[in-house]
From Swiss-Prot:
GO terms for biological process: photosynthesis. This is Photosystem I assembly protein Ycf3. The lineage of its organism: Eukaryota, Viridiplantae, Streptophyta, Embryophyta, Tracheophyta. It is a peripheral membrane protein. The keyword Membrane applies. Keywords: Chloroplast, Membrane, Photosynthesis, Plastid, Repeat, Thylakoid, TPR repeat.
């Protein structure tokens, strides 16, 4: 049984009903509909912390989905799961792949910046200030891209860029 039919959350049920109606009225292929169902079930599992199930659904959605824009969101969500699991190298790979298909994902740039900033802080704790600065510089570049796409968002990142004199 698809996850969308067993979820007990009222908002999720409402979203599922709306999504099902849209799938019926918008002209799409059966493959696109099936891909969306897997994507939606992946999001549901992910929101409940069932990352293994979410990944299975996302991988199946990737197999079926042909639209690069839609694939970018699947890849982004896979990146989120790897970030949550502390698998930062894998997460960065998926964020890059998402941005290759859709360069207008500020949230991917932000998450990449957060990972780079975290790695910079790790380098400081290990006493390697040169490596830390390189990670911080990379974080700054990603945050600048996120801010350029959505001015007014990422206020903390914007302040960090100003404080560290990395904002141009």
């Amino acid at each position: 049984m698809p996850r969308s039919r067993i979820n007990g959350n009222f908002i999720d049920k409402t979203s599922s009903i709306v999504a099902n109606i849209l799938l019926r009225i918008i002209p799409t292929t059966s493959g696109e509909k099936e891909a969306f169902t897997y994507y939606r079930d992946g999001m549901s599992a992910q929101s409940e912390g069932n990352y293994a199930e979410a990944l299975q659904n996302y991988y199946e959605a990737m197999r079926l989905e042909i639209d690069p824009y839609d694939r970018s969101y699947i890849l982004y969500n896979i990146g989120l799961i790897h970030t949550s699991n502390g698998e930062h190298t894998k997460a960065l790979e998926y964020y890059f792949r998402a941005l290759e298909r859709n360069p207008f994902l500020p949230q991917a740039f932000n998450n990449m910046a957060v990972i780079c900033h975290y790695r910079g802080e790790q380098a400081i704790r290990q006493g390697d200030s040169e490596i830390a600065e390189a990670w911080f510089d990379q974080a700054a570049e990603y945050w600048k891209q996120a801010i350029a796409l959505t001015p007014g968002n990422y206020i903390e990142a914007h302040n960090w860029l100003k404080i560290t004199r990395r904002f141009e």
